[in-house]
């Protein structure tokens, strides 16, 4: 059992939905980013998604692309992302952290080395958006052997023929991308999401968390009503990008978390 498994088991026992927050590691700089991440649990965040900055983030919309650029320009690296997670773990041993990013930085570091370091830093799971299930032997299977969850994305275009392949080695939870396209580009609609969540849950005994296009407390509540939880990324990252104070960012996060938890 990972921290992710424990968290979702506890939420299910309590009859609660999960609120997951995405932030880019090192945006706008290491110190501010760490302060934000440290404040997320008290703002109601159940699982933290920590973005790994990358030079070619093909699945990300402009808001998160800019966050990655800011982080890279401030000197953020894979090593510093691991350092940030380790610093967070000094004060918090229970909140799960999922590292989300692309395969190239991991491959460049060496898979075995990366997995050992990630585990040691307190990372609990990985989302690697550019590794399809056909490449499970590259990272997915070694990650799970190392005790990390490997979380897959399902989309509206993942048909019934493809879905079992996507879910085959998925663990922790399934991240349902509620819209086609890049992050932050459109809004999720609960009426569309509900049947898709049911379809995925019928194929895998895992929580289904919905992201992409959730940007208000009302939307967070609406999506949480038809899923096991909700992910918000671009809306939070946009506040950081606008130069809002850490306290203002966390206050906004709390409104989103309260929306999801009000179900």
Curated annotation (Swiss-Prot):
GO cellular component: cytosol
Chemical reaction(s) catalysed: (1S,2R)-1-C-(indol-3-yl)glycerol 3-phosphate + L-serine = D-glyceraldehyde 3-phosphate + L-tryptophan + H2O
One Pfam family recorded for the sequence: Trp_syntA
Cross-referenced InterPro entries: Aldolase_TIM, RibuloseP-bd_barrel, Trp_synthase_alpha_AS, Trp_synthase_suA
Pathway assignment: Amino-acid biosynthesis; L-tryptophan biosynthesis; L-tryptophan from chorismate: step 5/5
UniProt xrefs under PROSITE patterns: TRP_SYNTHASE_ALPHA
EC class name: lyase
GO MF annotation list: tryptophan synthase activity
Entry keyword set: Amino-acid biosynthesis, Aromatic amino acid biosynthesis, Lyase, Tryptophan biosynthesis
Disulfide bonds: none
Residues at the catalytic site: 49, 60
Domain of life: Bacteria
Subunit structure: Tetramer of two alpha and two beta chains.
Record function comment: The alpha subunit is responsible for the aldol cleavage of indoleglycerol phosphate to indole and glyceraldehyde 3-phosphate.
The family this protein is said to belong to: Belongs to the TrpA family.
HAMAP family associated with the record: Trp_synth_alpha (MF_00131)
Protein name: Tryptophan synthase alpha chain
Organism from which the protein derives: Roseobacter denitrificans (strain ATCC 33942 / OCh 114) (Erythrobacter sp. (strain OCh 114))
Gene: trpA
